[in-house]
Amino acid sequence: MILDKLQVKIIVISLLIFVPNLVYAQQIFTTYRDDGNATVFDGRWTFTQEWKRTSEDIIRFNDGNELSVKTGHDGNNLYVLLDFISQHKFAKFSDYGIVCMTTNSTKEIYPQKDDYCFLVTLGSHSPITLQGGDYLIQTNHFTKTKNDFGLIAIGGISDEHDRYSGIPHNTYEFKIPIKAIGRSDTYGFYVATYDANNNKVYNWPQNITNNEFPAIPSPSKWGHLISPDKSLPEFPWPVFAMASSFLFVLYLSRKQISF
């Protein structure tokens, strides 16, 4: 079966209407994992299979450095691993990793109270939770708030068990309770690691210049973390819309309906 020009136009229009962000937005897709309880939160890749059942995005920077971002969820918690594969010089309690999330997909210019960031330094087991909505420009409109009881974040050094490199390098592990940030099928999402020796932030989305502690850009510059269902659908609703449009065209073709 060959689609005629009109049918192709319908598909293209459907894509433009229903799926504008799939082409233009920077996105990371997370995945469901049922082995979260097996994770050993010690700030390193403890055993080979530990983070295997999570999504994977390798961020490559212009200076040759690489950052692996792995994400997953079990319905109650979000798991994030920032594996800075290329960083081999360490500054304990100065290097850090940070994860920022918001359920507000409109992503305002100024942080609101539904914007959260979780920061942990290298060598620390004590994360900091930052919440938006503060009036102080000096703190990027974020203020420190109480950690959720279930929050875990640890900065450490991975070694021979790491999937990407056996050379010791910085790694940051996060377990973020979903109730602490709210449920959504699409989160605003930003992650970064700070290399104190070079005074440089490596982040996703890339090319956001902000070395001022805690290196949190405007939420309007964050990307998206697409979660599998409203509790965290296997695809976000725009994909269903696209698929439905495509199947509708195929149905019309099979019925040989003339326009």
What do these predicted regions represent?
Residues 12-20, 246:
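Bacterial N-terminal signal peptides
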Residues 27-28, 46-135, 195-202, 208:
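Surface-exposed, glycine/proline- and aromatic-rich loop segments on solvent-exposed faces
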Residues 121-166:
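Glycine-aromatic-enriched beta-strand/loop faces of beta-sandwich-type recognition domains
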Residues 226-240:
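Short, threonine-centered small-residue motifs that mark membrane-proximal processing/anchoring sites
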